[in-house]
Amino acid sequence: MPSNCEILCEIIIAILLPPLGVCFRKGCCTVEFLICLVLTILGYVPGIIYAIYVIVFQHREEYFDEYRRPIYSA
C-alpha cells in the first residue's frame, strides 16, 4: 500500500506529465497508459484528470480493505 507521500508525488508528476504518472502506477504497456497518452495529446487537461483518477480512485478498495473487515468473527 503506497503512503500518502508517494501518492502526492505521483499526483504532482501526473500534473506535469500525465502519462508518466500513469506509467509509474500501472506500467507503460497498459490500456490506462494508452488512454492517458491519447487524452493528453488531444487535450492536456483531460489527460491530467484521467491520470489523477487512475492514481487516486482506481483500486482504492485495497486502501480501505482493513476498515471493511469485521471486528469479531462469528
From Swiss-Prot:
Membrane topology type: Multi-pass membrane protein
Intrachain disulfide bonds: none
Keyword Transmembrane helix in record: yes
Source organism superkingdom: Eukaryota
Cell compartment(s), UniProt: Membrane
GO CC aspect terms: membrane
Similarity field: Belongs to the UPF0057 (PMP3) family.
Protein name (database record): UPF0057 membrane protein At4g30660
Lineage: Eukaryota, Viridiplantae, Streptophyta, Embryophyta, Tracheophyta
